[in-house]
Amino acid sequence: MRCMRMLPALVIATAALGGPAAAQEHAGHHDAPAPQTGIRAELIRDVEMLEEKYVALAEAMAGKYDYRPAEGVRSAGEVFMHVAGANFLLPAMVGVSPPESMKAGSMEEMMASMRTLEQMTDEAEMRKELAHAFMHARHAIAQVPDGELDEMVQVFGSPASKRAALTMLVTHMHEHLGQSIAYARGAGVVPPWSAGSGAGGN
């Protein structure tokens, strides 16, 4: 969660980039072919696995998106939309613009976009947003050529390679998948991939 507490630094770094984002992507945004080998291919495969679990868990938790284990923490639905927002916005660190519908002309607009996502209440629309955000993340990784992976960029105010920034994008998804699994268990929902496993699984 440390990276999301530092989100304002990302906002400042990406303030020149341009509600809910299931609308249009930039023209040509998804033209980059998916790599077949190398670190980007491995990251994309990881994102695909994460997407399957997030989507399955979001479906399984239908009707329980308002569950939260304690006051003052995000609800299950807010966590899903937090992940969606990060998938749209974190790729900006490596130069991949968020969808046009994610307002990013200023810090205020960027933060408003994040808040708007986390305040969604229509569960069907939230699941669409989540799926769209994973698509954006996959295509963002594909857009960064292997030859640029060692280029240095600013990541939350500190220098890091594009490789490290893309890895952070994926580890952030893992972090909140664990959180979402704990939320599901607390709400009495067994993660679909664990159902029938006997030992309970994740």
Where are these regions (language model features)?
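Short, contiguous alpha-helical
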Residues: 44-55, 64-111, 152-202
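Acidic/histidine-rich alpha-helical segments that form the ligand environment
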Residues: 111-153, 161-173
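N-terminal pre-domain segments of enzymes
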Residues: 25-38
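Sec/Tat signal peptide C-region and signal peptidase I cleavage site
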Residues: 19-23
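Amphipathic alpha-helices that form helix-helix packing interfaces
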Residues: 50, 57, 86, 130-133, ...
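Bacterial N-terminal signal peptides
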Residues: 7-18
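Positively charged n-region of N-terminal signal peptides that target proteins for export
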Residues: 1-6
